[in-house]
From Swiss-Prot:
Originating species: Cercospora beticola (Sugarbeet leaf spot fungus)
Description of the deletion phenotype: Abolishes the production of cercosporin.
Keyword Repeat: yes
Protein name, entry field: Fasciclin-like arabinogalactan protein CTB11
InterPro entries noted in UniProt: Adhesion/Biosynth-related, FAS1_dom_sf, FAS1_domain
Family of the protein in this entry: Belongs to the fasciclin-like AGP family.
Stretches that traverse the bilayer: 328-348
Signal peptide: 1-18
Compartments where located: Membrane
């Protein structure tokens, strides 16, 4: 019967002894550089009075490592410093128990980084939280731009309006699509963006979802892509971008039709095991955070479906395209047939030569079991 009273007393004691964000940072030597920087850039009050927040506090080690990398927040552009610190604050409280309840599923969360400070999203920039699968002491990983994972080294430090988690490395601001592709090893898609002169167009968009084909998928279409002009390639790129929609994987539910940048449509559906399909391609990596939205990595290029009964393969992918792309490919049909015919002749000739050689490779030269090549 005394437990409720004890709980109330504990709650009151907690509130009576709660401290401000600045007071908590001041009591820990590992946050001395962070506290100085927050005062220098006038962020203490702004971060302090955001209710129900989670703040990923960079330790002295994190700030020194960032300076060694070339970004000294004491002397850097104040806007860069403000962006990094505001990106480290989430708009809700996420404790260790909250994150562990995700069961290794990543959760997209909103940060305090609002447009147009190093991001181009109407609702502000996002980060991702997941449970630490390595069984770390604190069990929290925060994912930021470029897919960088940062582990929490000390968790659940309370302050007046939320909770602090200490990190020994900085969170990375999400980059634009070209830098994300370049640094993420998405070489073929980056080449396609540059060849089609689509970089500026995509990077000017706010609230965009981009589906990035894996290198292997684009390599299969390379013979066709090589025959297209820059304008035609631009149309292909546009079919991989959905404007005015920031579609994190948690928002995909059931079947939905999306309109792409060039006005064609994509069909999104959830599989029985929770997998996500875009037309015939499967999403193999979700929620790559971008400066202007989000990207998903897929295992096939998106030439929107024209006939669901088409078989798989290069020409099926082409036939699945929009009428504009199909007309482009049809205009080159004689060239394609010639290339395929030459390839077939070459394969048959090599097979004939190989068979002939295998029949005449050796013959007996004496009666002692010795052989010689023909």
């Amino acid at each position: 019967m005394h437990f409720p009273a004890l709980a109330v007393a504990g709650c009151l004691l907690s509130r009576a002894t709660a401290q401000s964000l600045d007071q908590v940072l001041a009591k820990r030597d590992s946050f001395s550089l962070l506290r100085d920087l927050l005062h220098q850039h006038g962020l203490v009050d702004e971060l302090e009075f955001t209710a129900n927040a989670t703040f990923f506090a960079m330790t002295n080690q994190a700030l020194r490592s960032l300076a060694d990398f070339g970004i000294n927040l004491t002397t850097a552009d104040p806007n860069i410093a403000r962006a990094i610190f505001k990106y480290a604050q989430l708009d809700a409280i996420y404790t260790t128990d909250t994150v562990k309840a995700l069961h290794h599923e990543a959760k997209v969360v909103q940060t305090a980084l609002q447009p147009h400070l190093f991001n181009n999203l109407t609702r502000g920039q996002a980060a991702k939280l997941r449970s630490n699968r390595t069984g770390g002491a604190n069990g929290i990983l925060v994912e930021s731009g470029l897919g960088v994972l940062t582990p929490v080294v000390e968790a659940d430090i309370p302050y007046d309006h939320g909770v602090i988690h200490a990190i020994d490395a900085n969170m990375v601001l999400p980059h634009n699509i070209s830098e994300t592709a370049r640094l993420g090893g998405m070489t073929e898609f980056l080449n396609l963006l540059e060849r089609s002169d689509s970089v500026a167009r995509l990077e000017s968009l706010s609230d965009v979802t981009i589906f990035i084909p894996q290198d292997e998928a684009l390599a299969k279409l390379q013979p066709i892509l090589d025959m297209l002009t820059s304008e035609q390639l631009k149309s292909v790129v546009a079919q991989h971008a959905v404007p005015n929609r920031v579609l994190y994987q948690s928002l995909f539910d059931g079947v939905e039709t999306l309109e792409t940048l060039d006005g064609s449509t994509l069909r999104i559906r959830r599989g029985k095991r929770g997998e996500i399909f875009v037309n015939g391609a499967e999403v193999v990596r979700t929620d790559l955070l971008l400066y202007g939205g989000v990207a998903h990595l897929i295992d096939g290029a998106l030439l929107p479906e024209k006939d669901a009964s088409c078989s798989t393969g290069l020409f099926a992918a082409a036939a699945g395209g929009s009428s504009r792309v199909w007309k482009i490919l049809a205009s080159h049909q004689l060239t394609l047939l010639a290339v395929l015919a030459m390839a077939l002749v070459s394969i048959l000739y090599k097979a004939y030569q190989s068979r002939k050689q295998s029949h005449q490779l050796i013959r007996p030269s004496d009666g002692l079991g010795n052989y010689e090549k023909v």
